[in-house]
Amino acid sequence: MAIFHYISVLVPTTLAVATPYVLRRNGFDSERKYRWLLYVACLLFFISWYLPSPLIDGQDTSFTTHFVGGGLFTGLFWVYLVSSMKWRAHWPVMVFSVFALVSALGCINELAELFMVKAGLASIKLDDTNWDILANTLGAATIWIGWIIADFMMKKGRLSGDSGN
């Protein structure tokens, strides 16, 4: 289980340092304005490893870990990237982009779990992948819906802040 303690620190720390650097190097100088989103996302990733998860159909899952550290984390990371790059597209494209990101990161996570088990670095069950994917997707969808509501309210003048324009 010790490897997961390292992952809970290493992944968010690396992202918190590397992502702003990469964005600034590529001309996205306004990313600093949105960096708090990155930090909140990374904090959620860290915390998610230590939250209890429910039994589902009598099966021990990591549903909460994936909802918070997979879905909510990815959703906030996506909002940080979209806001920093001032990227906007039609809503189906935006939905697809957040779904693609959460799916890609979820796939990488499942492959990492498989590798760690097969390499003897961890002893975890690999039979909850379907719940992991659902939790990741629901978490990201929660953030996306919140982002849409906040964006709508900013356009209507009900929230102060950057409307992304």
Name each model-derived stretch.
Residues 1-125, 138-165:
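Bulky hydrophobic segments
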Residues 125-134:
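Short aromatic-rich membrane-water interface segments that cap or initiate transmembrane helices
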